Design a protein with these regions (language model features):
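A generic structural signal for short hydrophobic patches within well-formed alpha-helices
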Residues: 10-11, 44, 126
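Helix-adjacent hinge/juxtasegments
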Residues: 51-77
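Acidic, PIN/NYN-like endoribonuclease modules and their adjacent C-terminal/linker elements
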Residues: 2, 73, 101, 109-147
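Acidic catalytic patch
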Residues: 37, 70-90
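Short, well-structured N-terminal submotif of metal-dependent ribonuclease cores
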Residues: 1-39, 52-62
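Conserved glycosyltransferase catalytic-site signature
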Residues: 7, 41, 97-101
Length: 147
């Protein structure tokens, strides 16, 4: 089983926002080896700049190191640019969210059992994917309201 993290859940966990406990449950499963955990490199960049604004660049990097130590791996998205741009053109999510969906779909296409989850927050960019064939099984929200 695999989980792909959007930036929002990782920020919620790192800054103890609403829903942090739910994200911690997912991260514990990654740490324990029960799940493979990924974050796309663009979502990691999003995490870093927001965390740096909230705290500092040093703290942002410390949070990223903690996530790596828990077993969260960076998912290289270089080969997904065409698919992400198609998602952006068709469904209009932010570019970071388009890449998160593209990464989850890429992992899902290589998983015979379709056990890939994209963990997201309350952002409405994912609403359309929850109602679209081929994506609905991927999306799971850790909270229903923004922090």
């Amino acid at each position: 089983m695999t989980v792909v993290f959007d930036a929002e859940p990782l920020l919620a966990f790192s800054f103890d926002e609403q829903g942090a406990g739910e994200v911690e449950r997912w991260l514990d499963q990654v740490y324990d080896g029960e799940l493979d955990g990924y974050v796309s490199t663009i979502n990691l960049a999003e995490f870093r700049y927001i965390a740096a604004r909230e705290a500092s660049g040093e703290q942002a990097d410390a949070h990223i190191n903690d996530l790596r130590e828990m077993g969260v791996s960076e998912y290289n998205i270089d080969g997904l640019w065409e698919y992400a741009s198609d998602l952006k053109a068709t469904y209009s999510p932010s570019i970071g969210d388009a890449y998160a969906v593209a990464a989850a779909k890429d992992l899902d296409s290589n998983d015979q059992q379709r056990n890939v989850t994209l963990l997201v927050g309350a952002v409405d960019d994912y609403d359309v994917f929850e109602d679209t064939e081929g994506f609905v099984h991927l999306i799971e929200r850790f909270r229903d309201q923004s922090a």
